[in-house]
Every structure is written in structure tokens, then in C-alpha cells.
Regions:
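"A position-specific structural signal for the A-helix of alpha-solenoid helical repeats
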Residues: 62, 92-103, 133-141, 169-180, ...
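Residue signature of alpha-solenoid helical repeat architecture, marking inter-repeat boundaries
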Residues: 54, 86-93, 128-133, 165-170, ...
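N-terminal alpha-helical membrane-insertion module
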Residues: 1-77
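Alpha-helical transmembrane segments and their immediate juxtamembrane interface regions
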Residues: 123-145
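Long, non-transmembrane cytosolic or organellar matrix-exposed soluble domains/tails
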Residues: 194-254
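Short coil/turn connectors between adjacent alpha-helices in alpha-solenoid helical repeat scaffolds
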Residues: 61-70, 104-111, 142-152, 177-187, ...
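Alpha-helical repeat scaffolds
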Residues: 75-84, 110-123, 147-165, 185-199, ...
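N-terminal topogenic membrane-targeting module
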Residues: 50-125
């Protein structure tokens, strides 16, 4: 299902629930004469409405997250960003900014990620939970765009992180050091070897860096096997393009 249809159905269900609740309230007013029972009926209808809306929003959010992250439906990503680009609420604006940063990161637009993440982090009212993710994307993008970055400079930057989530902070440091080894220092690093993830892009990312690690260890057969797992995916993804390039350079891409 595309995002436009999903959002249209979600809004239709909300309106339908509101209309149904109004009709039930009117019916209660006509049918029930006892004031106490009318009040009880009204409260019951409202409670049912709020419960339905809560479950509906939860289902809608879960479906969006599944299509965005678990299925990695890139057409859904594009529609989601396009149709929500003019949201008015500040909290929704920053949420869309983070979603845009995540999309740019997957596409290999690391300069855009750095620019937008820094813009977001400059906002004094930005909630810390968003700061954490913007900082993480920023640091990873810096490593992937600066071939002259020294390990000492990287470690200084990592020590200056203000990520308050200890799990994300530790993960960001380990990922950045692994990326440095694999893409700048060109030395093997086993960080990605035992990782797993429920989200598809992260799964593909793990495969890509496992392949890089195998290449640096001289295990070309394993590297080729891993890169071939990626080339069947959407070629607009940065890591798919890199996998295709590797196989072309090796003369093994069909």
C-alpha cells in the first residue's frame, strides 16, 4: 500500500468514527430519558471513541514504521516525505527533518545529512531525544565524507558527543570507529560480523560492511558472495551502488 492511500484511509476512519459517535450520542439522548443513564451512555460512547482512535493511531504508526523500516519501501519513503513536507506543528517538523536525514543517509547524500543535522542541532528548543539521533547521523556522515580524518581527531569528536542515551552513544562510537577502519584506514574490523537488526536497511548495511571487511582480509570469495546479496536491492541505495561498483571493478558484475 502506498502512503497516500494509507493516510487517506486513516483520515477516513477518524471522520467515520467521529460521525458514528455523534449519531450514538444523539440516539442516547432520544432513547434514554433518565439523566444518570444519559450521562453514563455519553461517557461510554466517548470512552469507546477515544479507545478506537488510540488503537487506530497505533495501527497507523506501526504500519508506517513497518513500510519505512522493516520493508524499506522506498516509494513509500518518498511519498511520506513529499506529503508531509509542509506540516505545521514544530514537533512534526523536526520529526520530518529527522526522516529526511535518514533518507539522505541511505541514498549516500552525506553532505546533505551533515548540513541538515547541523541545522537541526542549532535549534535551542530541540528535544534531547532528537539531538541524540541527529548527532549520531552527523558523526557517521563525517566519517564517510572526510578521507583525511585522522583517528585522533575522530576520537576527540566522539568524546565530545552529547548523546544522552548510553546505548546509542556507545553504538555510535563503535560504528564510527569501525567505519574509520574500513573506509579510511583500510584495515579490517570485525564490529559488523556479529550484528543483527530487524530493519532492512540496517541489515543491508551490515552485509555491506561485512563484505568490506572480507575484502580487507583478502577473502575475495566471501566478499563477492556478500556483495552479490546487495546488488538485487534498489540501486538508488548508496551501499547497493558501492556493491555494484566493486563487482564491476572485479569483473564479476552481470
Amino acid at each position: 500500500m502506498d502512503y497516500k492511500t494509507l493516510r487517506k484511509n486513516y483520515r477516513l476512519y477518524i471522520r467515520s468514527a467521529g460521525v458514528l459517535a455523534m449519531l450514538l450520542i444523539i440516539c442516547v439522548g432520544f432513547v434514554v430519558r433518565d439523566t444518570l443513564l444519559q450521562t453514563a451512555g455519553l461517557l461510554l460512547v466517548l470512552a469507546g471513541l477515544f479507545l478506537f482512535l488510540h488503537l487506530l493511531k497505533k495501527s497507523y504508526t506501526n504500519k508506517c514504521n513497518t513500510l519505512l523500516h522493516v520493508d524499506l519501501d522506498l516509494a513509500f519513503w518518498q511519498q511520506y516525505l513529499q506529503l508531509n513536507k509542509n506540516v505545521k506543528k514544530p514537533i512534526l517538523q523536526i520529526d520530518m527533518k529527522l526522516t529526511s536525514v535518514a533518507y539522505s543517509f541511505m541514498m549516500g547524500g552525506f553532505d546533505t545529512v551533515i548540513k541538515e543535522a547541523r541545522e537541526a542541532l542549532s535549534q535551542k528548543e530541540l528535544l534531547q531525544k532528537y539531538k541524540n539521533f541527529f548527532e549520531s547521523y552527523l558523526m557517521r556522515s563525517i566519517v564517510l565524507t572526510d578521507p583525511d580524518l585522522s583517528r585522533e581527531e575522530l576520537e576527540v569528536r566522539l568524546n565530545e558527543l552529547t548523546i544522552t542515551d548510553p546505548v546509542l552513544a556507545e553504538k555510535t562510537k563503535k560504528v564510527c570507529l569501525a567505519l574509520y577502519d574500513l573506509t579510511i584506514a583500510h584495515q579490517s574490523n570485525d564490529y559488523f560480523e556479529d550484528l543483527s537488526n530487524d530493519f532492512k536497511y540496517q541489515q543491508l548495511e551490515i552485509i555491506y560492511y561485512q563484505a568490506l571487511n572480507a575484502t580487507l582480509k583478502g577473502d575475495k570469495s566471501r566478499a563477492e558472495e556478500l556483495f552479490r546479496k546487495l546488488v538485487s536491492e534498489d540501486e538508488s541505495l548508496y551501499i547497493v551502488q558501492k556493491a555494484q561498483q566493486y563487482l564491476k571493478d572485479e569483473g564479476n558484475y552481470l
